[in-house]
Amino acid sequence: MQKKQKIDRKGALYMAEQLTLTWIGHSCFKLDCGDYTIVFDPYEDGYVPGCPPVRESADLVLCSHDHKDHGASHLVKRIEGRENPFQIQVIHTWHDDQKGALRGRNQIHILDDGTFRMAHM
């Protein structure tokens, strides 16, 4: 059975009653699961034209690669001490077709809490 989805006008996609996925800008998203928060691919201030500065707090920050438009984990305020509800699988890939020679490594994160599964690339 597929869960109902609803997209609101603020960019949040509700996948389940206690899961909220919010687009921050560019490739940056915030996933709230109950009281646990993950931010994906925060970008440096002013580096992505038209995107607001990343001013989020999170239990965990996951970056697909270490470029300024995806790897500014230092901008996210960390929340300590809460248990991660997800099993996280990391698949290492290349950011180009030259085995990383041009743009480096990339990581795909697959999150699974037993009822919800998503990938961020």
Regions flagged by a language model, labelled:
Residues G11-L60, H67-K68, K77-M121:
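Core dinuclear metal-dependent hydrolase active-site scaffold
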